[in-house]
Regions:
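Extreme N-terminal starter segment of soluble prokaryotic enzymes
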Residues: 1-3
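Class I SAM-dependent methyltransferase "Motif I" SAM/SAH-binding loop
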Residues: 6-10
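A short, Lys/Arg-enriched amphipathic alpha-helix followed by its capping loop at the start of a domain
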Residues: 16-23, 41
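The conserved SAM/SAH-binding core of class I Rossmann-like methyltransferase domains
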Residues: 27-28
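Conserved SAM/SAH-binding beta-strand->alpha-helix loop
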Residues: 31-32
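S-adenosyl-L-methionine
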Residues: 36-65
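Class I S-adenosyl-L-methionine
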Residues: 58-67, 77-211
């Protein structure tokens, strides 16, 4: 199944989809400092370097053999983040969500996934979020929106993220977010679980000698 990756960064989200069996023939990233990292991580993916606002279907289509099954991406979070500008859709970076939707409408894939920071669900952004949901609906997608925490899904990290997941309406898919495997506190994976095996090999900093 072919996936288009937008706002790809170094390709972390892409890696998850590749491990799930998807192919990502083409991706886009704006930041030149990340290009080489992405290419090393995903040598089989063609990276379109540059501003997503300037990219059209004609730029992407030549790298796809067959139909596009899905579009994934993490539009910039700074304008939504509690540690960022808090301007949401009023910030130019927040408006890049519109370009994600524009490309979605051009390809009409079976599904999409868009991820962002938990601050997007702050009350101050409610009108903007409802507008985004309406745009997805107008584009022909049934959308599910929720916030999940990585610690509930087997990760030793407190990391809350908002996910928009949509399926084309003609497919009549009723998506439900899966229950986390470690939602129960007794099953949580901690940093201790991850690095405990290093106790016999790590050298205490006080015992290290300069080279």
């Amino acid at each position: 199944m072919n996936i288009i990756s937008l706002f790809s960064g170094c390709g972390g989200l892409d890696l998850g989809f590749e491990k799930a069996g998807f192919d990502i023939p083409v991706a886009n990233e704006f930041d030149p400092k990340i290009y080489e990292t992405f290419k090393v991580n995903h040598p089989k993916t063609h990276l379109i370097e540059g501003d997503v606002r300037q990219i059209t279907k004609a730029d992407i289509a030549p790298y796809i053999n067959g139909e596009v099954d899905g579009i994934i991406g993490c539009p910039p979070c700074q304008s939504w983040s509690e540690a960022g500008s808090l301007k949401g859709i009023e910030d130019a970076r927040g408006q890049l969500f519109f370009d994600y939707i524009r490309i979605l409408k051009e390809f009409r894939p079976k599904f999409f996934l868009a991820e962002n920071v938990s601050g997007m669900l702050a009350n101050r952004h409610d009108e903007a979020v409802q507008n985004i949901l309406k745009l997805f609906d107008d584009a022909g997608y049934d959308v599910s929106l929720t916030m999940v925490n990585a610690k509930d899904y087997g990760v030793a990290e407190e990391r809350k993220r908002v996910f928009y997941i949509g399926f084309r309406k003609d497919l009549k898919i009723k998506f439900k977010f899966p229950k986390g495997s470690t939602e129960d506190d007794s099953k949580k994976i901690t940093l201790r679980n991850i690095i405990w095996d290093l106790q016999y090999t790590a050298v205490p900093s006080g015992e290290k000698k300069p080279p």
